[in-house]
Amino acid sequence: MPYGIEDIITELSELIRETLVDGQRKRSPSYWKEDPGHLEAMHRHLVRYDRGELVDKDSGAHPLAHVGTRALMQAWLESHGR
């Protein structure tokens, strides 16, 4: 069976979901539209990954999943003039 875009989106969205659940547990649901710190958070998670961390201590998600989620949030903000 061919592996399509929807399959990829489904699998990757689970990684994103793990990071979002953690974020909403700590912050308001719309925090990501107000948070000016996406780039700083991306950097922080990249540094942790570079130091060998493969599981975020708070969320249990992979640090690069946090980087990806924050990158998408920042891209959305910039794409919507915020």
Briefly describe each language-model feature range.
Residues 1-82:
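Intrinsically disordered, low-complexity regulatory regions
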